[in-house]
């Protein structure tokens, strides 16, 4: 979109095999312009390089909406410095062709940290790492195309890039670090590589993701990765995943579908808290524990079948549309408010011969909206035990019945 008016000095440049040339809208020169730069293309020939001092001068002399093209220049080192930090006049930049990494940064700095009007960046093939805070709070950055050579991404690299819509992470990358795309609210599409092994905490928190497939190679996912992703509807977990961490999908209000990995052992606190559209899930036999509020507020659940020793406090709090709960033989304790506010709960099945201990209000307000019969199915030989230990349940109108006479949903009775 820029018109380059080449003066007679271009002939001089054409005859040289080395040197640095600065092309502006006014023509070609061998010295940097002194007036504020609206457009600048730097070309280096032979063994000549763009010096660190020259780059500093360019960064300090930008006009509003500046476009800087260094794609045909060789920089003095392979490490790009932090001269453009908070340069709000910068609109577009192409990095020098030999850049491999960025200068290490601190919490409040980065190569393009706070370049609020940067809309486009072009990376060279050969770039291997994108550093901490590199493009943090580049609120107008619309797209990035990471070279296939990239292997390392650092924390906060694209934090707060609010207009970024899609990203393809190159094959060879093994770790998504913490906060990488946190608060990229327009980010709807991410492709993860088959080489990926871990995803750091809050990496995609508050993004616009609509669905995500996590590669089978991933064995570690940290907390809050998809927290507050209000548009996220589907997640495909790797089947070998053994732990779903705390707050993973907390407040993902559009989430409807997840798969429970076949080797899953633990689900952390608040992992799916207030996922109000999440449909019924099937827990694998390998499951050992659910932490507090792990499925609290999953109001679209209609049925819960679970068989673990301890059901944590508030684990299924306010699952208001659940009509049946089936507790397996392993269950020994049910925590405080674990199933509180299950107001449409019609049947509870508990297969343990010894009545599990109940925390305060474990089934508080259960079945409060049920107009017909409410039944507590238990082993016939354990009636006395449940009558004594589960008075908080029977006092809410649940009648004890033999588990062997439990009625199927189609109205047919079966013998267990």
Description of each model-found segment:
Residues 1-13:
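Extracytoplasmic cysteine-anchoring/structural motifs
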Residues 109-113, 131-136, 154-159, 177-182, ...:
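Consensus positions within tandem repeat domains that build extended binding/scaffold surfaces
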Residues 351, 360, 364-365:
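N-terminal low-complexity/intrinsically disordered extensions
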